[in-house]
Every structure is written in structure tokens, then in C-alpha cells.
């Protein structure tokens, strides 16, 4: 067993700083009791922010983690999409030859006035640069590229994107959009669902890295999956999982592990209860496809290998 604080330092040293931020990816499973898990979750999130990552927390108690799109929606709700658009826009206008004179969000009219140039020509040059930087960046899925391009155009205030369309894009990213017809003008025709949610999630860390962040750190707390029986109705809070939902959640995690070659600049830390290793009905034994990918059948009884995909942590301090 590894001390929780020591493992956070290990993750930072071996993964967050020097590997993931250079284009790598990792999916780590951490087993801990409730007391240790809560502190570890906060500590690893703080370490991620200090290392330059955007951190998103997903809890199986409040998010339906057996659906990939719901994981993406929860992550998306914790992202400041407009801030990223402004960062990308400032880089684009500078590359087009019109660096923003102030720290405020550059708009087409203000830049045209400052540089004494025609608004239409400036808009054309910046649009061309945005197209090159975003729409032709094929490391991101097409719908994601279109959405980011439209958010940048909305920030530039050229009139190409209405406030209604801007709001619809944000709602679409967060899973709150009711009618897809609101995005016809943006040329986005599909909802984010099982068929494209994984690619949307994989596009996000690339977009973050493009805009100056180290990448994306996602902390997924799956301790709720171990709850077999729902409490009385008046005591229930959040999500509970049937046997089928449990297996679907494990399949989502299995897909993340198998997709690490496609994923870049992203670290996923999955926090689980000790029952993950001991409960035959709701633990790893229930889904061999996941167990075979992370379980260490041969290991030191007194000390875990911190490089392993599955690590047991506790409150005691053990040097790693």
C-alpha cells in the first residue's frame, strides 16, 4: 500500500509533469477507503491545477458514468468555453498581424479602429487565420472544431454568430440543448451521444493544450458503483446502478484504457472503494474485460508498484 500524499507526488512527478503534458496519456485506478479517498481526490485536483491542467471532477453518485456522453457533459460543465475562445482569438489576431492592444477581448470594430484598417479586410484576415488554426486542425473531431470556431467568431463580434447561436453551442456542449434546429446555422446537426462522445472528450485536451494549458485531468469517483441496494426512498440521493448499469460503466472505463493511444495530454484518475477488489458481484470480477487490463495478479504484498494501472493507497506514508 502506498501513502496517499506520496502517490499524489508520484503522479505529479512521473506523469503530470514531463509525460502527459508532452503529449502522453494515462488512466490510473486508485483504491482507497472513504476517508482517504476524499482527501486524495482534493489533493490530486489541486496538484493538477498547480501543474497547469484544467481539472474536471466526475462523481458516479451524481453523474451517470455508464454513459460516455454524460461523462463528457459533466466535464464540459466545468470548462470555461468562452475563456478558451478568447485565448484562441487573441492568438489568431496576433498571427494575422493585428495583436490586441489591451487585455480586453479584441473585437473586430475596436481592432479596425486601432489599426486604421477596413473592417471587412480585417475580418477576412482573422477568419482565414481562425480557419487555419481551428477548422483545419484534424486532431479534433469535426463537430468540436466547428463549435470552437463559432465561439471564437462570437467573441470577435463580427455578426457571424448571434447570441442565440452562441448560447445554443454552450448548451449543446453541456448536454442541455433541447432542439438541434438551433444549431443549423452553425452547421452542427448531431447531438453528442454514445457514437461521438468519446471523440469529443478526446478533442478537449488538445484544444486546452492549443490554448496554453498543460492538458486535461479528469478525476472519476466510482465508489457509488459498489452500492448494491438502494436505500429507502426518503434517504436516496443521486444515482444508483443496476447490474446492467454497472457493467456498462466498467465498459466505458475499459474503452478509455484501450483508447490511450488515441488520447493525448489527458490523465484520467479513477477512484474506487476497496470492494472493487473483493466484491464478486459488483467488483472487477463482474467484468473480466476490465479486470484483465488493470489487475496485478502478481505483486508484492507489502508494497504496490506505483507505475501499475491499479494502485492501493492509504493514509500511511511509504516512500515511492
Annotate each predicted stretch with a short phrase.
Residues 1-22:
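Pre-Walker A adenine-sensing motif
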Residues 6-10, 34-38, 196-198, 247-250:
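A short linear-motif detector with a strong N-terminal bias
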Residues 7-12, 85-88, 148, 290, ...:
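Generic hydrophobic, helix-prone segments enriched in Leu/Val/Ile
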